[in-house]
Design a protein with these regions (language model features):
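Short glycine-/polar-rich loops that comprise or flank the Walker A/P-loop
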Residues: 1, 25-26, 81-82, 108, ...
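Non-catalytic terminal extensions of ATP-dependent helicases
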Residues: 85, 104-105, 189-582
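Alpha-helical "lid/cap" subdomains adjacent to substrate-binding clefts that gate access
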Residues: 45-77
């Protein structure tokens, strides 16, 4: 690494950036601690002439043939053509790699990004500019730790190109404004500090640049996935597990706890017939193997995957809701995509709030009810009860919790594409987060479900999910499959795209979409909303009935139309596909 020079800046961020570029101290990486701030400032820079016409032409040539397939992609393309990059964990991998390639080619004088820089992205940077030193860590706002600061600052300076790297830390806005007012001879009013807001000053900056990094604390858990990998290794499972635990950096007491955890996990896997002991060892001295009737390349990558595998065995494959139940089980053990879940919750609360306001409910009562609304959690009660029973025989499961949700299930139920999800919930900054979640669900489905539990509908869902992922960004699948094959994926594999399949290619999903649209009709009829119903029909059919006239005899005899869960049953709809295979 090259030596670093540190500066504390009391100039507005725009002045700092332009001054650095005029001094020839680019390329710059401006660190923000939220994705919104990074994108907002990047858009501000579009009004600043950062590049020449010739540089813009070079960028346009580099972008030729690249597929900006999402709403965020359109915004990104515009930024790149102004010489501004954006980089954060919520982006699709293909967009992050594009920004990195352009930066490596020297085409981007400025990149606005988050502290993902600290994990070592492949971008050559001369100057790192901290827009601030306070971040929200998921629980509270705090000053960045010394180790975090040094990890990010250490990316400044290009080995082999620079003799030094430059790190700038911006003063808080109120300090900058106070200095400006003093220079103008004005009296600056002291602003009241907002609750929970953390500030910093030059002493904070000096401490971060000179203090020793915090001590790293080792953390380790034994998981079913780790045990399966140890079972696949040559040699005795006991010795392999002992070697892994005793060579870790945790304390002796923690090592003993890990050994007990590993024993409980193995006993649970054996009892569930996931693994089997041999009477005689294999040639490579393995005494344990994965049971033959489980999926090829079985992967229990989520901590509660063994529980999910056990729960799947009790589901009825003949149930019309079986595919959706499987999705709910899988989604309950996959890591939460919080930006999407919070957006789902917000949408449900807004819809309910409008109904309560129309009904004249008091503000206090309305807020109390809205506080109880969360994102959709199908099978939450059933899964929670089953997990409590499972824990009685598998104590290791007590340290993990389920997180029921409905993302892939909602997409299947409503026939939604990736773009539909992003647009419906307004989360274009979280496209990468959502795609990673969908990919995790796909991989979990593919590697978890026993062969006898894979129905035609499940195969259709798997095919659809793979197609969806490949259309949006193939790199996640390419990297996963290359990792399993023990190699590094090529750029061609990462960047490969596939054309979208015809809607009718996947019969299960096509029929679900038909049922969803038809139940939307029923719901509107139940509300006697013939106007919206007519507008819906205009979008999907050339000819449609006069719903007011058609429903008049019904309303003359009945008071309402049921729209409960039972009303959604597939038994109430018949789909005729006999006309030369068309539906």
């Amino acid at each position: 690494p090259v030596p670093l020079t540190f500066r504390y800046s009391r100039s507005p961020l725009n002045e700092t950036v332009l001054s650095l570029l005029e001094e020839g101290l680019g390329s710059l990486y401006i660190v923000f601690f939220t994705q919104r701030e990074a994108l907002d400032y990047a858009n501000q820079l579009k009004s600043t002439a950062l590049i020449t016409k010739e540089q813009r032409a070079r960028i346009a040539e580099a972008l030729r043939g690249f597929r900006f397939s999402t709403s965020f992609g359109v915004s990104l393309r515009s930024l790149l053509l102004h010489g501004v990059g954006i980089h954060h964990a919520g982006m699709l991998p293909k967009y992050r790699r594009l920004v990195e390639r352009l930066a490596q080619a020297g085409l981007l004088p400025v990149i606005c990004g988050t502290d993902t820089l600290g994990v070592g992205i492949n971008v050559p940077i001369h100057t790192v500019v901290f827009s601030g030193l306070a971040k929200f860590d998921g629980h509270r706002q705090r000053i960045v730790k010394v180790r975090e600061f040094q990890q990010i600052a250490g990316r400044a300076g290009r080995a082999g190109f620079d003799t030094e790297g430059l790190v700038i830390v911006q003063a808080p806005l109120d300090e900058i404004e106070a200095l400006r007012a003093t220079r103008k001879g004005q009296k600056q009013k002291k602003k009241k500090k907002e609750p929970g807001v953390v500030s910093w000053n030059e002493k904070t900056f000096e401490k971060l640049t000179t203090a020793e990094s915090e001590t790293l604390v080792p953390r380790m858990h034994m998981t079913a996935s780790m045990l399966l990998n140890l079972i696949e290794r040559p040699g005795a499972l006991f010795e392999n597990t002992k070697h892994l635990i005793t060579n870790s950096f945790v304390t002796r007491a923690q090592q003993r706890a890990l050994a007990l955890e590993a024993f409980e996990l193995f006993r649970g896997l054996e009892k569930s017939d996931v693994v089997t002991r041999q009477a005689e060892p294999f040639e490579d001295n393995r005494w344990v193997h994965i049971s033959g009737d489980l999926p090829h390349e079985l992967a229990l990558n989520q901590p509660l995957a063994p529980f999910a595998l056990a729960y799947l065995t009790i589901l009825d494959t003949d149930s019309p809701d079986y595919p959706l139940q499987v999705l709910s089980v899988v989604e309950s053990i996959v890591e939460n995509p919080y930006p999407l879940l919070y957006a789902q919750q917000k949408k449900l609360r807004n819809e309910r709030a409008q109904i309560l306001r129309d009904d004249g409910v008091s503000y206090q009562e309305m807020m109390a009810e809205l506080d109880e609304i969360t994102w959709p959690q199908p099978l939450a009660e059933e899964l929670s009860a089953a997990l409590n029973s499972y824990r009685e025989e598998h104590p290791w499961a007590r340290q993990w919790e389920l997180s029921p949700k409905s993302v892939v299930r909602e997409m299947v139920e409503n026939g939604m594409t990736f773009g539909d999800v992003i647009a419906t919930y307004g989360i274009s900054r979280a496209e990468g987060t959502v795609l990673r979640y969908i990919t995790d669900c796909y991989n979990t489905l593919r590697h978890l479900i026993p062969a006898e539990k894979i129905t035609d509908e499940i195969r259709d869902i798997l095919d659809w999910l793979r197609s969806l992922i490949e259309q949006v960004d193939n790199s996640l699948l390419a990297e996963w499959e290359a990792l399993q094959a023990g190699r590094v994926p090529t750029e061609e594999e990462r960047d490969a795209t596939t054309p979208p399949p015809a809607l009718t290619d996947n019969r299960y999903l096509f029929e679900r979409l038909i049922r969803t649209v038809m139940f939307r009709h029923v719901s509107l009829l139940a509300l006697d909303d013939t106007k919206t119903l007519a507008q819906l029909d205009e979008r999907i059919a050339e000819e449609f009935p006069d719903w007011y006239e058609e429903t008049e005899p019904y309303w003359a005899e009945y008071d309402d139309i049921l729209t409960d869960q039972d009303a959604r049953s597939a038994r109430f709809i018949t789909i005729d596909s006999s006309d030369n295979g068309s539906t």
